[in-house]
Amino acid sequence: MTETDGQKDNNQDTAQAAADPVVSKPYIMPDDPEEGSNEALVREAADARDKMLRTLAEMENLRKRTQKEVADARTYGVTSFARDVLDIADNLQRALDAVPADARANAEPGLKALIEGVELTERSLLNALEKNGVKKFDPKGQKFDPNFQQAMYEVPDPSVPAGTVVQVVQAGFTIGDRVLRPALVGVAKGGAKAAPSDGGGETGNLN
C-alpha cells in the first residue's frame, strides 16, 4: 500500500466517524453518602422513640398492677381470718336473741350485767371488723338481691311487695366491695312487685 492509499483510508475513516450519530449515555447522579446516613439516623431515632414509648407504657401498666395488688392485699388480706371470726359474731348474736325482751326488762342485776357484757363484746367485735374493712349488713325490708343475699324460703305475705326480704336468718358481711358472706333471708311471696334495690342493704354495725 502506498502512502497515498493510506491517506485515503484515513480520510474515509474520518468521514465515516463524522457521519455516525453520537449516542450519549444518561448521566447518573452518584449516591450522596451523607444523605443515606441521615435517613438511617432518622430511622434509628424513630425506632428508639417507639421502643421508649412501649417501655414507658409497660412501666405504667406495671405500676398500676402493683398498686392494685398492694391495695387488694391491704383490703382483702384479712379475708380468711374475718370469715373465721364471723362464727363468733353469729354466736354472740344468737346468745342475745335467745333472751326475750320481757326477760331482759325484768332480769336480775346479775343477768342484766351479763347481757350487757355480751352486747358490749359484740359491738367491740363488729367495730374491730369494720376497722379492717368488714361490714355487717341486714337487708330486712329491702328487695331481694341475689348478689348480696341467699333466699332460704318464701313467706306468704300480701302486705308487702313480692320479693321483699321479710326475715333475716343470718346477717351478711362485706369486705371492701366484695361479699364476704351473703345474708340468709326469707322472701315475701305475693303482693305487688317490689321496687328495684340499690344493693345488699345498709352496711355497718347493725345490732
UniProtKB/Swiss-Prot annotation:
UniProt keyword annotations, A-Z: Chaperone, Cytoplasm, Stress response
Protein localization: Cytoplasm
A Gene Ontology molecular function term of the record: protein-folding chaperone binding
Biased composition (Basic and acidic residues): 1-11
Region of interest (Disordered), residue spans: 1-40
GO CC annotations, alphabetized: cytoplasm
PROSITE patterns: GRPE
Family statement: Belongs to the GrpE family.
PANTHER family in alphabetical order: GRPE PROTEIN (PTHR21237), GRPE PROTEIN HOMOLOG, MITOCHONDRIAL (PTHR21237:SF23)
Name listed for the protein in its UniProt record: Protein GrpE
Species, as recorded: Rhodopseudomonas palustris (strain ATCC BAA-98 / CGA009)
Gene: grpE
